[in-house]
Amino acid sequence: MSLDDALSSLKRGEFVLLHDSSGRENEIDMVVAAEFVTPEHIARMRQHAGGLICLAINSSLGKELGLNYMHDILSSSAHFDSKSRGMIMGLAPYGDHPTFSISINHYQTYTGITDRDRALTIREMANL
């Protein structure tokens, strides 16, 4: 699939499989444009992707919303011994700190766990 084909698929709300790099994590991510996410997309990712369901946002939106990286949140905690702090402050095998943040839920969700709740949160984040 060419880059143009992948972009067209994303614009239609279809999944694109994205391989990050054999020199990094060497994994394939299922990617779909947030504005099109449905509960069916979430179910498919949950059942077939085998990992976290993540929403990528740009850093300026994250800062505006006060969404700090989990690494920064944990590293500022005084409740870790030196072994735990070493694990938190360490780098991933690909050379960076993990860039995950905290879990978020839209205010109209119930638990945030269901496919419907997750899809709603992701779609609404696309509107920001």
Residue ranges and their predicted role:
Residues 1-128:
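Catalytic domains of riboflavin
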